[in-house]
Structures are given as C-alpha cells and as structure tokens.
From Swiss-Prot:
Catalytic activity as recorded in UniProt: a (2S,3R)-flavan-3-ol + 2 NADP(+) = an anthocyanidin with a 3-hydroxy group + 2 NADPH + 2 H(+); a (2S,3S)-flavan-3-ol + 2 NADP(+) = an anthocyanidin with a 3-hydroxy group + 2 NADPH + 2 H(+)
Reported function: Produces the terminal flavan-3-ol monomers required for the formation of proanthocyanidins or condensed tannins in leaves and flowers, as well as in the skin and seeds of developing berries. Catalyzes the double reduction of anthocyanidins, producing a mixture of (2S,3S)- and (2S,3R)-flavan-3-ols.
Record's keyword terms, sorted: Flavonoid biosynthesis, NADP, Oxidoreductase
Protein name: Anthocyanidin reductase ((2S)-flavan-3-ol-forming)
One Pfam family from the record: Epimerase
Pathway: Secondary metabolite biosynthesis; flavonoid biosynthesis
Protein family per UniProt: Belongs to the NAD(P)-dependent epimerase/dehydratase family. Dihydroflavonol-4-reductase subfamily.
CDD domains: AR_like_SDR_e
Any further remark recorded for this protein: Hyperbolic binding of NADPH and NADP(+) to the free enzyme, with a single binding site each. The most likely enzymatic mechanism is sequential ordered Bi-Uni-Uni-Bi, with NADPH binding first and NADP(+) released last. This enzyme is strictly pro-S stereospecific and the reaction mechanism involves two hydride transfers from two distinct NADPH molecules.
Tissue spec. comment: Expressed in seeds, grape skins, flowers and leaves.
Regulation affecting activity: Inhibited at NaCl concentrations higher than 200 mM.
C-alpha cells in the first residue's frame, strides 16, 4: 500500500503541503524523524510541488493528490498517521462571493478531513491551523486590551458590516468553530494553533502574500501598506510571528500530551506607525514612510501567547530576527536592492 512507512516511525499527515506554512512544517517534521504524508491538489504541477520533491531528500515523504471538497480523497494519506495537521484553507481576498469562494469550502474542507480522521483508527490528535483573524475582530473600545484563546471574532459584525476582505476572517472563524463542534461530537483530540501575520522566508516558488504584507513598509507598496493599516483598524493591532516558530508550535502542541484547546502563536504586537519607526531605524537604506498623519499611533490590543509559553514553548525569533530574515529573503528574490 502506498501509505505504508517503516514500522516504529511516527507518521504525520500535512494537509495542503504546497503552502507557505505547510511546506516548512513538512520540512521540520522530516528533520525530526517523522514519516510524512502530504496532500496537494495537483501533484503534476511542477511549479507548486518542486520544493516538496526536494524535501524528499530529507526523509520519508509521500505526496498524495487530495482535494478539500472530496472527503474520500483523504482516506489514503491519513491512513496509518499518528498526527494530522490541517493547514490548507481557501483564500480569495478579491472575491466577490466570499460565502461560496471561502466560507463554505473552508468549513467543508475541515469537516471532510476530520471525517477521514475518524475512519483512520490510528490518528491520535488533529492540529488545525486557525488564524488570529478568528480571535481579534470585535468592536471593543479603548487601548491596552488583551485578547487570548477565550476570545472569538465577532461574526455578526463581520457579516453585517462586511469590511474589506471580511470573507477571510469569517471563513477562519467559522471553520474553527465547525472543527470544535465536529471534534466534540466525534470524540476527536483537536488542538488549534492561531498564528498572527507571518514572515521570515519561504520554501515555495511564489512569495507568500503574508510576507509581502509584512514587508510593505520597506518595499513601499502603497496597496499593501493600506492593507496593514486595514489590519490594524479591523483587528486592533499589527501582530507578527516567524513562520518557523508557528511550525514549531504546531509540532510542540501535537507532541505535548497535556496540550488542549486553542493556542495563539504571536511573537510581537505593534502598530503601523510603531513598526515603521522601528524599520526606518533598523534599515535606514530603505525609504520607510514614518508620517501617518492622524492614523492611530498605538495598537488597541495585545494578542497574548501566554498559554503557549506556559505550556513550555519558547519563541526563537523576535521582531528584529523576523525582519532581518524577511529582508534577506526579499533581496534573494530580487525584490529589494542590497
């Protein structure tokens, strides 16, 4: 059978292996000695899977064709796995119809993967990648607010006010809620990891949109700078983590028997003006804008990773290291001058 790996090795399935987070997660799992099954929509798409084929040199990696809309396509990749990491999610920021382009497929994808997990008797734990967008969006006022795993994004506000790109936070919130409902009803050991905006470098051939967004103040991309401002206005802060720490957190909560529930993964909380000031000082060679007029200079909230840290996790990267690596990555990609 295609799914058989050497006996005695822990086996993990990573759903959506071509993505920014998933591909690095595959790499770290292989480096830890796991046998890995990963799913992709089209294994014949060389551009999308070439970095995964290169990772096969690191260890026992099998690539499967699977589609989030097809429940049965996950049976083979999940069979025999100890852990299942569901990282894939549909993203169409410019969608005219978020309900059908993002929200319904995200919920359906989560349920389809979890149904396959219930049939595979080997699965000990399912780890779902959620998003800070499922936690932070609310109509709370004031500054100095702290949000943690108890908080959920206000879906009624999103679906009635429909702020720009509302479909993404709505899809992440509703997909995570659907996962918890299914896990409870079917006795699945589920953990969700809730990352903030991620930066660093990527194994994928395309530059991930989140690194582009994080780097916008340095590249001067006005459209993306407005995206950062929109993020601060909608979610209350600009919060960031290194993609490697996010992947390490996924593996940490999978392996930690006492882990349960939701875990926010956030290394630093800031605002657009504060971040611009920091970047302008650290990288004076780039023309980082620092005048934002009457735009709110401070974030209204802090996204807390206290629960993850108390569990025993330590972050490798602070905001300095996150941006140093992102700058080097953009230089290597020819997107920044030296």
């Amino acid at each position: 059978m295609a799914t058989q790996h050497p006996i005695g090795k822990k086996t993990a399935c990573v759903v959506g292996g071509t993505g920014f987070v998933a591909s690095l997660l595959v790499k770290l799992l292989l480096q830890k000695g796991y046998a890995v099954n990963t799913t992709v929509r089209d294994p014949d798409n060389q551009k999308k899977v070439s970095h995964l084929l290169e990772l096969q040199e690191l260890g026992d990696l099998k690539i499967f064709r699977a589609d989030l809309t097809d429940e049965l396509s996950f049976e083979a990749p999940i069979a025999g796995c100890d852990f299942v990491f569901h990282v894939a999610t549909p993203v169409h920021f410019a969608s005219e119809d978020p309900e059908n382009d993002m929200i319904k497929p995200a919920i359906q994808g989560v349920v389809n993967v979890m149904k396959a997990c219930t049939r595979a008797k080997s699965v000990k734990r399912v780890i779902l990648t959620s998003s800070a967008a499922a936690v932070t969006i609310n109509q709370l006022d004031g500054t100095g607010l702290v949000v943690d795993e108890k908080n959920w994004t206000d879906i009624e506000f999103l679906t009635s006010a429909k702020p720009p790109t509302w479909g993404y936070p709505a899809s992440k919130t509703l997909a995570e809620k659907a996962a918890w409902k299914f896990a409870e009803e079917n006795n699945i050991d589920l953990i969700t990891v809730i990352p903030t905006l991620m930066a660093g470098s990527s194994l994928t051939s395309d530059v991930p949109s989140s690194i582009g967004l994080a780097m916008s103040l340095i590249t001067g991309n006005e459209f993306l700078i407005n995206g950062m401002k929109g993020m601060q206005m909608l979610s209350g802060s600009v919060s960031i983590a290194h993609v490697e720490d996010v992947c390490r957190a996924h593996i940490f909560v999978a392996e930690k028997e006492s882990a349960s529930g939701r875990y926010i993964c956030c290394a630093a909380n800031t605002s657009v003006p504060e971040l611009a000031k920091f970047l302008s000082k650290r990288y004076p060679q780039y023309k980082v804008p620092t005048d934002f007029g009457d735009f709110p200079p401070k974030s209204k909230l802090i996204i807390s990773s206290e629960k993850l840290v108390k569990e025993g996790f330590s972050f490798k990267y602070g905001i300095e290291e996150i941006y140093d690596e992102s700058v080097e990555y953009f230089k290597a990609k020819g997107l920044l001058q030296n």
